[in-house]
């Protein structure tokens, strides 16, 4: 009921690394350690749970899954990096663990199943939770995570300088200039072939119950703009 010849339904879910991060957020870690005194066993059980769900979704007909993952946005945030430093924790060690867990969950996935990931920086009522560039996480996330595509937030300067990206924000009703976005896409060709690039909104329009500061019509106008640009660049 969610698909037709032009549309493929997508199932989104928190990334395995996101689940792990939530299990240790603030005081959650005490309860988690009580249930899982062996941290490696927790890693393995999360991976098995995700592999099971992925197989079940595929059996039910799902062919497109997206991991929503705030962990990489946090790792790139200077404030979070300072927090880790004060905790005598290396940023590289955290990134390596998140990468390993996500890839464990992706093992033995069914043929013909597309799995992508969206690096989210928070999207509460047109605000955000983290900022900073992608250079800290790029050697882990972009170079080694075994997904088919990355949906990366980059709608203003808070995301740092990252030349291949130019996206359409979901936090503001203002429509981006079509020619400017197209120019950014072609700029990205300096780094990645055009047939490996895609255009999407920067995040969801309602990542929480209250949603962002856009009307329904303004949201549809954003999606219409994305569609028009995609057809101009890649064809219908």
Question: What do these predicted ranges mean?
Answer:
Residues 1-236:
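Domain-level signal for soluble alpha/beta catalytic cores
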């Amino acid at each position: 009921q969610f698909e037709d010849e032009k549309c493929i339904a997508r199932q989104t879910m928190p990334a395995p690394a996101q689940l792990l991060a939530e299990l240790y957020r603030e005081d959650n870690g005490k309860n988690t350690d009580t249930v899982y005194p062996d941290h490696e066993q927790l890693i393995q059980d999360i991976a098995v749970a995700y592999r099971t769900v992925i197989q079940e979704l595929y059996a039910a007909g799902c062919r497109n899954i997206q991991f929503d993952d705030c962990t990489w946005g946090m790792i790139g945030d200077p404030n979070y990096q300072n927090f880790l430093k004060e905790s005598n924790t290396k940023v590289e060690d955290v990134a390596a663990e998140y990468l390993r867990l996500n890839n464990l969950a992706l093992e033995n996935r069914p043929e013909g199943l597309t799995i992508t990931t969206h690096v989210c920086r928070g999207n509460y009522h047109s605000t955000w939770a983290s900022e900073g560039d992608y250079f800290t996480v790029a050697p882990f996330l972009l170079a080694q995570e075994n997904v088919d595509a990355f949906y990366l937030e980059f709608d203003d300067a808070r995301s740092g300088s990252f030349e291949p990206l130019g996206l359409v924000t979901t936090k503001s009703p203002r429509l981006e200039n079509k020619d400017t976005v197209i120019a950014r896409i072609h700029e990205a060709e300096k780094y990645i072939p055009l047939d490996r690039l895609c255009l999407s909104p920067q995040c969801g329009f309602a990542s929480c119950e209250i949603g962002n500061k856009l009307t329904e019509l303004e949201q549809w106008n954003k999606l219409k703009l994305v569609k028009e640009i995609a057809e101009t660049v890649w064809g219908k």
